[in-house]
Amino acid sequence: LSRRQRQMCIRDSYYTNPQYPEFLRSKYQAIEDNEQRWESYQAEDADVVLVAYGISSRISKEAVNMARAEGFKLGLIRPITLWPYPVKAFETCKNAKAFMTVEINILGQMVDDVKLAVENKYPVGFYGTFFGLPEPEEIVAQAKAMLEKEGK
């Protein structure tokens, strides 16, 4: 490329429309307002709400059924969109005393998302596995232990 062509590329690679930042801000706000997707399963009256997606969510749903059969109020939020994160889903959990992410990793990648969604008003725990899949019995036991630890 000639010097002039390089200068044109550099100059033209920046978007200089002054309305563009506001357009982007309003576009992202509309997406955040309208595109949150989730599935809620018995979370409205739950004492502890599990947050899981993928295989973990199917195992967590089994844990919810098992806990409910024992009289322990466990619920589940399954995020369908990870961006925008479904913060509106957490508004329906009026009785929740704690939240716990169930993940097939040892890092707790969703813990911070859940803490932000509940605005740090509730304890947020993590149950993860590295080798193999989580067991419903282990999830229920961990949720009960978390509730006892919080003294609620």
Where are these regions (language model features)?
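Generic long, charged, amphipathic alpha-helical segments
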Residues: 61-93
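Single conserved hydrophobic/aromatic residue that forms the stacking wall/gate
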Residues: 1-10
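C-terminal substrate/ligand-recognition segments
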Residues: 51-60, 67
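Peripheral docking tails and interdomain loops at the edges
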Residues: 103-152
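Glycine-/acidic-rich phosphate or pyrophosphate-binding loops and their flanking alpha/beta elements
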Residues: 25-48, 61
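Solvent-exposed alpha-helices and their adjacent loops that cap or buttress functional pockets
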Residues: 40-44, 91-94, 116
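An N-terminal assembly and electron-transfer interface module characteristic of large anaerobic redox
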Residues: 4, 80-89, 137, 147-151
